[in-house]
Swiss-Prot record:
Subcellular location field: Cell membrane; Cell projection, Ruffle membrane; Cleavage furrow
Keyword annotations of the record: Cell membrane, Cell projection, Coiled coil, Guanine-nucleotide releasing factor, Membrane, Phosphoprotein
Gene transcribed to yield this protein: Psd
Protein name (Swiss-Prot/TrEMBL): PH and SEC7 domain-containing protein 1
Species annotation: Rattus norvegicus (Rat)
Coiled coil start-end: 523-549, 581-608
């Protein structure tokens, strides 16, 4: 019977009609059509109770359904055609489409089950049920759902793994539903860089979930390392991806590489863990030998000693470790650089007005540390300029300069701000510096200039040691010019060198010098003096403790070398901070910013008493072997004596 406010649907239900024994009535046919519409959208219901759960009527509504009558009678229904057979699924070809998704498979199966009893959709009078009553929207029954709707519906029901299988670039937040086929597809795209950059590869392989592990395993299958040594395989692998990210992520990528290498070469190493240990050791060795670290480089003996007992409790073959060390030392490991990052770097280098002149090439005059980039200041004061002859005595970390780069070269020096520029031509204010002149420039922050009393081949020579422990020899035209250069370099370094960074906290026993900031200090002159004096006391105290701790002990080999390096460092820092503090005290006493006044005050008080380094305080780690006395031929003593005679003040 009719009720007000009931669910309505334009299904023809003529008065006096009743269900026929020969077939279903109009209500049944139309209800099946509605159900088929929902099945086409991927939704199935087993009974009418399912609809009641979706659209529960209000307390005033009747639990019965009523249907409105259309103005025209229904069209006659022909016999339903036989359902079309399901098309066989094609094998995976590496590409994805909507037809491959589970939505199509489920829809075809349901149509095959219900197709025998449903009328063709194009013969129905295009009924549509009310969205207000059922809470569901249905597409017209006379047409297939549009492709955009199919993609949207399927994406909403698929999990992340299935979306990856369809070609999405999304990754899983966890590996609970990792799918091998999806991992294979993603690995293939990563290897071919299909929609990915080289920087993206390591990020996908380095995640700690099951799906990323599957992807990494499939990705490494594209590499065949059979017959290669470990360093050769590592070079091939690192050229295909930019090894970026956090330490744990990079370690996972190297673990996948080690697993693949051991699979290809099971006889080369004893275990997969051994391959991983040796791979990480090669990466650390590469950083130690070719990185910007400060301190002594790792030797072959150190490399072998560090790996003792790490090959599943045993030792790696000694000849293998020697060969690997030699390979990394002769040719450093290089991995791919992301093209976008490279273009960004090149665009920065091409900036016509760079704020920082970065040293991008090596050489005797260039810095090897990124902390020592030169920052020229256009308005910086010029403290001194004049003729100088330069010789490179030691490269960074006091490494011996190659023989072909030790020659004396004439320059015109300009001490401008905290930078000593070396030009081929005389100083001209306002003239732009060439690339070669910038390359030869030397930053004097935390530097110390001292008289080269142990160098007898040329007169009027002084040492200059920089913050990264490069050592230069400079010859001035006269004794007065030499003393002036020493004083002005040290005064400028004392005024502008910022306090050093706090020492790093580490369990490493190996001695390494701390990094020194290249930026100018922000302290006042009085605060700068107190800082230098505090560092002087600290260095003196640490030097006494170091000597007392090793008094009477005879160290050998590596331990003795480290003790000597630390003692030399502490002695030099004590001399440097003592010089800085004394010169600033003289400057404050002179009450003048002119360096001529400071030089005059030092000349009156005596340079040694006022803090200038005494002649014996040479900054070289070891005596220069070329300065040792040698056997001379008869008649050469006079010439040698003339060259070693220093003019008296």
């Amino acid at each position: 019977m009719p009720h007000s406010g009931l669910l309505k649907s334009p299904v023809p239900f003529l008065p006096g009609t009743s269900p026929s024994a020969d077939g279903p009535d109009s209500f049944s046919c139309m209800f099946e059509a509605i159900m088929e519409s929902h099945r086409a959208k991927g939704t199935s219901y087993s009974s009418l109770a399912s609809l009641e759960a979706l659209a529960s009527p209000g307390p005033t509504q009747s639990p019965f359904f009523t249907f409105e009558m259309p103005p025209q009678p229904p069209a006659p229904r022909p016999d339903p055609p036989a359902p079309a057979p399901l098309a066989p699924l094609e094998p995976d070809s590496g590409t994805s489409s909507v037809a491959d998704g589970p939505w199509t498979q489920r829809r075809e199966v349901e149509e095959s089950d219900a197709g025998a009893t449903l009328a063709p959709r194009k013969e129905l009078p295009s009924p549509s049920h009310s969205e207000d009553s059922l809470g569901l929207g249905a597409a017209p029954l006379g047409s297939e759902p549009p492709l955009s709707q199919l993609v949207s519906d399927s994406d909403s029901e698929l999990d992340s793994t299935e979306r990856l299988a369809l070609g999405s670039t999304d990754t899983l937040s966890n590996g609970q539903k990792a799918d091998l086929e999806a991992a294979q597809r993603l690995a293939k795209r990563l290897y071919r860089l299909d929609g990915f950059r080289k920087a993206d590869v390591a990020r996908h392989l380095g995640k700690n979930n099951d799906f990323s592990k599957l992807v990494a395993g499939e990705y490494l299958k594209f590499f065949v390392f059979t017959g290669m040594t470990l360093d050769q395989a590592l070079r091939v692998f690192l050229k295909e991806l930019a090894l970026m990210g956090e330490t744990q992520e990079r370690e996972r990528v190297l673990a996948h590489f080690s697993q693949r290498y051991f699979q290809c070469n099971p006889e080369a190493l004893s275990s997969e863990d051994g391959a991983h240990t040796l791979t990480c050791a090669l990466m650390l060795l590469n950083t130690d030998l070719h990185g910007h670290n400060i301190g002594k480089r790792m030797t072959c003996g150190d490399f072998i000693g560090n790996l003792e007992g790490l090959n599943d409790g045993g030792d790696f073959p000694r000849e293998l470790l020697k060969a690997l060390y030699s390979s990394i030392k002769n040719e450093k490991l290089q991995w791919a650089i992301d093209e976008e990052e490279l273009r960004r770097s090149l665009s920065e280098l091409a900036d016509p007005n760079p704020k920082v002149i970065k040293r991008v090439s090596g050489g005797s005059g260039s810095s090897s540390s990124p902390f020592l980039d030169l920052t020229p200041e256009p308005g910086a004061a010029v403290y001194k300029h004049g003729a100088l002859v330069r010789k490179v005595h030691a490269d960074p970390d006091c490494r011996k300069t190659p023989r072909g780069k030790r020659g004396w070269k004439s320059f015109h020096g300009i001490l401008k701000g905290m930078i000593l520029y070396l030009q081929k031509e005389e100083y001209q204010p306002g003239k732009a510096l060439s690339e070669a002149e910038l390359k030869n420039a030397i930053s004097i922050h935390h530097a110390l200039a001292t008289r080269a009393s142990d160098y007898s081949k040329r007169p009027h020579v002084f040492y200059l040691r920089t913050a990264d422990w490069r050592v230069f020899l400079f010859q001035a035209p006269s004794l007065e010019q030499m003393q002036s250069w020493i004083t002005r370099i040290n005064v400028v370094a004392a005024m502008f060198s910022a306090p050093p960074f706090p020492a790093a906290v580490s369990s490493q026993k190996k001695f390494s010098r701390p990094l020194l900031p290249s930026a100018a200090t922000r302290l006042s002159q009085e605060e700068q003096v107190r800082t230098h004096e505090a560092k002087l006391k600290a260095m003196a105290s640490e030097l006494r403790e170091h000597r007392a701790a090793h008094l009477g002990k005879k160290a050998r080999g590596k331990e003795a070398e480290e003790q000597r390096q630390k003692e030399t460092y502490l002695e030099f820092e004590k001399s440097r901070y003592g010089t800085y503090a004394a010169l600033l005290r003289v400057k404050m006493k002179a009450a003048s910013e002119e360096l001529d006044a400071i030089e005059a005050a030092l000349a009156q008080a005596g340079s040694t008493e006022e803090g200038c380094p005494p002649p014996h305080s040479s900054p070289s780690l070891q005596p220069n072997p070329t300065s040792q006395p040698r056997a001379q031929r008869p008649g050469s003593e006079a010439r040698a004596g003339a060259g070693s005679t220093r003019p008296k003040p």
